[in-house]
Amino acid sequence: MALGRVGLTVGLWGLLWVGVVVVLANASPGRTITVGPRGNASNAAPSVPRNRSAPRTTPTPPQPRKATKSKASTAKPAPPPKTGPPKTSSEPVRCNRHDPLARYGSRVQIRCRFPNSTRTESRLQIWRYATATDAEIGTAPSLEEVMVNVSAPPGGQLVYDSAPNRTDPHVIWAEGAGPGASPRLYSVVGPLGRQRLIIEELTLETQGMYYWVWGRTDRPSAYGTWVRVRVFRPPSLTIHPHAVLEGQPFKATCTAATYYPGNRAEFVWFEDGRRVFDPAQIHTQTQENPDGFSTVSTVTSAAVGGQGPPRTFTCQLTWHRDSVSFSRRNASGTASVLPRPTITMEFTGDHAVCTAGCVPEGVTFAWFLGDDSSPAEKVAVASQTSCGRPGTATIRSTLPVSYEQTEYICRLAGYPDGIPVLEHHGSHQPPPRDPTERQVIRAVEGAGIGVAVLVAVVLAGTAVVYLTHASSVRYRRLR
């Protein structure tokens, strides 16, 4: 019995401990839930002392969980996105090149993209404005700015219209554009909204400001942007050393031709490797032409021909394409010296004879009589002999004397440019005519006058007979 009571007591104590453990295990979740409120400022323990120097803060009550649960439980699924028109971006028109610079004669392509490129009712127009003449577009329009609801300014020429059937009949098409243009200087290729403007040949006429206008057919000026197309053309450089006579100063001329733009073309001269600093020896002039600019620079040496060896000149050209880029080229040449010829004139019988010694090959004589500025009509016979100097010869020309003129001029023709006029003046009294010759001339002149009088009499008689016959015929008809 004692052992049974002891076992019963142990069993009851074991059941009691099991019950305590179960109660503690069930009570732990409830204690975890109450941690949040106890940590809030409104439920802080009153035994904690406050610091008087610390600022007082207004407590924030906790948000009830019920509202959060209710909101989460009543949330509806997000509706699918609407399929309306797409929003316009901050850059509705985007071009890959807003300020292209290309060489003269090259082929230029400009690509631009537009919004709503899949809409078949969209319309694109491209206008061209001359850079220097049209003030309506402003001196420097913003090239990357996209304008909204701005139509093309006046004064432009139409390059392209995607809806040619809607083009104003009074519009002015650019040369090489529009229906039936041949040859075509402009073309637009690519899918709608991603067009490429192709300028077949860039010149001074095709450069300028291009205005792209994009929109719907009923609102064609929705967007617009500017593209500036500029052309450059490097100069061609040539040097021309002047041929001079003995005793003349050496000269050379350099020409920078057909370049664009005409910002600056600077020449620096060298004579036999030494720079020419004296500005009085250099003369430079720039001229604007339809195909660009040309600059001509001439240097005059202090040395003269025949007093030393020929001089070699070098011109150095520096051309500034813009404020940043420039190119530099050189050209050289040696001046030549020609002997100064000696011209003589003599009269032998019925001929005038002119002789010039040591003239360049190809030089001939031209005769002038009296005050007449045209060469003499009579044929002059020329002959040529050796002079003894390479490339030169002695020439002689004869001309029959004139019975009307007393002044004679024989002039050398065929010298290079820059050589002064070389000529000789002479006087000669006309010889007396032969009496027989004079009688023959007078007889011929008298016969000519007689023939003229006879012809006049015959014509007058014929006219009288014709008028008499016509009057008689008319009188008979009246009867």
Curated annotation (Swiss-Prot):
GO terms for biological process: adhesion receptor-mediated virion attachment to host cell; symbiont entry into host cell; symbiont-mediated suppression of host complement activation. It is a single-pass membrane protein. The chain crosses the membrane at residues 447-467. Residues 468-479 are cytoplasmic. Its main location: virion. PROSITE patterns: IG_LIKE. Pfam families: Marek_A (PF02124). Residues 105-119 are annotated as: Heparin-binding domain. Disulfide bonds join 95-112, 254-315, 354-410, 358-387. It is found in: Virion membrane. Residues 28-446 are virion surface. Keywords: Disulfide bond, Glycoprotein, Host-virus interaction, Immunoglobulin domain, Inhibition of host complement factors by virus, Membrane, Signal, Transmembrane, Transmembrane helix, Viral attachment to host adhesion receptor, Viral attachment to host cell, Viral immunoevasion, Virion, Virus entry into host cell. Residues 1-27 form the signal peptide. GO terms for cellular component: membrane; virion membrane. Glycans are attached at residues 40, 51, 116, 149, 165, 330. Residues 235-327 form the Ig-like domain. Residues 30-100 are annotated as: Disordered. Interacts with host complement component C3b; this interaction inhibits host immune response by disregulating complement cascade. Major attachment protein that mediates binding of the virus to cell surface heparan sulfate or chondroitin sulfate. Also plays a role in host immune evasion by inhibiting the host complement cascade activation. Belongs to the herpesviridae glycoprotein C family. There are seven external glycoproteins in HSV-1 and 2: gH, gB, gC, gG, gD, gI, and gE. This is Envelope glycoprotein C. The lineage of its organism: Viruses, Duplodnaviria, Heunggongvirae, Peploviricota, Herviviricetes.
